C-alpha cells in the first residue's frame, strides 16, 4: 500500500484522472485547467450536490472503496433523473486522512468511473485536501433537460395518480443486516481482547499463544450473507432509475411532479404535497415490497410497512401523472400506482389493509438530528 504523501495533491489528481475520456458534446474542457468548460446551447442545466461523511453516510467496516465510489456517483445521478433530466458531468472533491492509501483512491475512482460509464457521464474536475480524521466526499452533478421536460415537486394536481418505481424498504433491510453482522464482529473482538488481557495479567503464556493462533480467524471473518444479496446490493450499490425516465418518455408520459426516494416514501410524498399545495391518499396494500424485504423484516421483528414508508435510500422514483395516463401506465412493468392526489384539507393519508386511515408521518432520516 502506498502513502498518498508520496504523490502529493497534484500527483494524486493526475493519477486518478489520467484515464478519463470525455463522452459528452456539452463537455468542452474537463480536468486540467482552473475550470471545466461546459456548453448547453438548447437545454437547461440541472445542478445538484451531495456530501457524504464517513461514520454518518457510510461505514468502511462493510463498504469497500469501489462500491463507495459507485454509490457516491449514483445518488447524484438520481437527483438529476428526479427532475426528468439526464446527468452529463460530475465534479468530485475529497478530504482524506493519512490512513488512506493511493490504492484506496484508485478503487474509489474506479467505482465512480463505472457508474459514470453506465450513464455516459464525464468527470470534469474536483479537489483534494487533507482531513484530520476520516473521509469526506462532495460530488456536484450537472445534468440537462429541455425546458418543457423538467419536472418539479410542485406540479401535482388533484386526481393525479401517485406512482413509484421498483420496490421499497430493501435498502433499509440491507442496512439492518450489515449493522447486525458488524455488531457480532465487534462483540467477538471485544471478547477476544478481554481474554488476551486476562491471560497477560495471569502471565499465562500457553493461553496467549492459543489466543494468538485464533487472531487470524477474526481477521479473516466473513459473515454469511447467503440469500440476502439483493438487500445488500440495494443498500451498498443502488441504481439510479434513469431507465424509468427513458421508458416514461417512450410512452409519452410526462409526470406532473417527481422526486427520488432517498429519505423514505412518506417523507418524499409529504414534500410533494407541501410544494404542490395538495393532499394525498395512498394504500398500504399497493406499496411494492420485495419478498426478501418482508422475510427479513420479520426476522428483525420490524413493521414491514414502516420500513417501506420510512427506511429510505431506495433511490426509486416517486411521481404523479394525470389520471388520463392511467391506461398507459397501469401495465408498465416496474411501476406501481399506490394512490392519488386529493384536496389539501384532506391531508396526507395512509389507508391500511383493514381500511383504517392514518395521517402519514415524515420519519425519514435526518442527518442533523442529535443521537
Where does each model-flagged region fall?
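Extreme N-terminal cap/leader segments of soluble proteins
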Residues: 1-64, 83, 92, 370-371
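Glycine-/charge-enriched secondary-structure boundary and capping motifs
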Residues: 2-21, 63, 96-122, 130-137, ...
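Glycine-rich anion/phosphate-binding loops
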Residues: 29, 61-75, 99-110, 148
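Residue-level signal for inorganic ion chemistry
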Residues: 37, 76, 84, 123, ...
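Glycine-rich anion-binding loops of enzyme active sites
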Residues: 39-42, 52, 88-181, 340
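Small-aliphatic-rich amphipathic alpha-helix that forms the alpha element of a beta-alpha
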Residues: 65-89, 110-118, 247, 267-271
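Phosphate/diphosphate-binding glycine-rich loops and adjacent basic-rich segments that engage nucleotide
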Residues: 147-236
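A short, well-structured juxtamembrane/interface segment
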Residues: 240-249
Amino acid at each position: 500500500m502506498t502513502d498518498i504523501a508520496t504523490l502529493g495533491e497534484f500527483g494524486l489528481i493526475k493519477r486518478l484522472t489520467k484515464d478519463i475520456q470525455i463522452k459528452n458534446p456539452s463537455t468542452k474542457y474537463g480536468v486540467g485547467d482552473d475550470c471545466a468548460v461546459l456548453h448547453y446551447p438548447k437545454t437547461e442545466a440541472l445542478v445538484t450536490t451531495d456530501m457524504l461523511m464517513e461514520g454518518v453516510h457510510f461505514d468502511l467496516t462493510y463498504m469497500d472503496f469501489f462500491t463507495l465510489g459507485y454509490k457516491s456517483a449514483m445518488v447524484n445521478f438520481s437527483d438529476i433523473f428526479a427532475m426528468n433530466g439526464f446527468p452529463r458531468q460530475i465534479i468530485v472533491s475529497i478530504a482524506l486522512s493519512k490512513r488512506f492509501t493511493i490504492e484506496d483512491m484508485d478503487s474509489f475512482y474506479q467505482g465512480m468511473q463505472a457508474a459514470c460509464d453506465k450513464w455516459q457521464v464525464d468527470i470534469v474536475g474536483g479537489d483534494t485536501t487533507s482531513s484530520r480524521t476520516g473521509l469526506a466526499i462532495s460530488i456536484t452533478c450537472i445534468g440537462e433537460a429541455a425546458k418543457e421536460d423538467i419536472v418539479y415537486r410542485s406540479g401535482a394536481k388533484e386526481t393525479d395518480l401517485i406512482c413509484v418505481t421498483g420496490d421499497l424498504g430493501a435498502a433499509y433491510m440491507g442496512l439492518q443486516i450489515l449493522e447486525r453482522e458488524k455488531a457480532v464482529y465487534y462483540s467477538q473482538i471485544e471478547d477476544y481482547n478481554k481474554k488476551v488481557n486476562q491471560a497477560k495479567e495471569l502471565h499465562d503464556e500457553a493461553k496467549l499463544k492459543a489466543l494468538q493462533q485464533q487472531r487470524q480467524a477474526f481477521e479473516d471473518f466473513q459473515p454469511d450473507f447467503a440469500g440476502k444479496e439483493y438487500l445488500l446490493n440495494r443498500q451498498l450499490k443502488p441504481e439510479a432509475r434513469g431507465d424509468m425516465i427513458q421508458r416514461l418518455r417512450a410512452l409519452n408520459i410526462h409526470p406532473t411532479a417527481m422526486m427520488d426516494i432517498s429519505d423514505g416514501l412518506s417523507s418524499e410524498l409529504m414534500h410533494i404535497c407541501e410544494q404542490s399545495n395538495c393532499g394525498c391518499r395512498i394504500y398500504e396494500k399497493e406499496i411494492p415490497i420485495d419478498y426478501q424485504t418482508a422475510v427479513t423484516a420479520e426476522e428483525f421483528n420490524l413493521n414491514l410497512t414502516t420500513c417501506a414508508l420510512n427506511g429510505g435510500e431506495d433511490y426509486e422514483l416517486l411521481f404523479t401523472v394525470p389520471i388520463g395516463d392511467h391506461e398507459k401506465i397501469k401495465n408498465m412493468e416496474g411501476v406501481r400506482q399506490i394512490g392519488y392526489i386529493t384536496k389539501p384539507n384532506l391531508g396526507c393519508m395512509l389507508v391500511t389493509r383493514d381500511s383504517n386511515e392514518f395521517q402519514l408521518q415524515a420519519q425519514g432520516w435526518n442527518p442533523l438530528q442529535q443521537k
